[in-house]
Amino acid sequence: MTKKRRNGGRCKHNRGHVKAVRCTNCARCVPKDKAIKKFVIRNIVEAAAVRDISDASVYSSYVLPKLYAKLHYCVSCAIHSKVVRNRSKETRRIRTPPQRSFPKDMNRQQNAQRK
């Protein structure tokens, strides 16, 4: 039978069994290596209220904390919510992950720490 993907849609090479995780969207059990993972960094406070809170803050250089969440999606939810797209036969062979884009404030913080 023909094979659609070299890895069979998984990352479990010579492992036998991998524990399951729950999809954050539909709660379906998905093997951890097959689940599509997305790491999300968000401000706890919404963008409209950031300025009000920083003005009301007693501390001048107080940085608002962020929410860090690792989301696990099953394949169908990841396609439906446009986290991933189905690709043509030629582009399916490209195994390098796409270029990651980071929030602008995160890049500024990393540059400040290096200096």
From Swiss-Prot:
Q: Which Gene3D superfamilies match?
A: Ribosomal protein S26e (3.30.1740.20)
What Gene Ontology molecular-function terms does this entry list? mRNA binding; structural constituent of ribosome
Q: Which GO terms describe its biological process?
A: cytoplasmic translation
Entry GO CC: cytoplasmic side of rough endoplasmic reticulum membrane; cytosolic small ribosomal subunit; ribosome
Per the record, the coiled-coil ranges are none
The protein's matches in Pfam families, at most eight in alphabetical order, are given as:
Ribosomal_S26e
Q: List localization entries.
A: Cytoplasm, Cytosol; Cytoplasm; Rough endoplasmic reticulum
Q: Which domain of life is it from?
A: Eukaryota
Q: Which UniProt keywords apply?
A: Cytoplasm, Endoplasmic reticulum, Ribonucleoprotein, Ribosomal protein
- Region: Disordered; residue ranges are 86-115
Binding partners and assembly? Component of the 40S small ribosomal subunit.
The Swiss-Prot or TrEMBL record describes its family as follows: Belongs to the eukaryotic ribosomal protein eS26 family.
Specify the protein name.
Small ribosomal subunit protein eS26
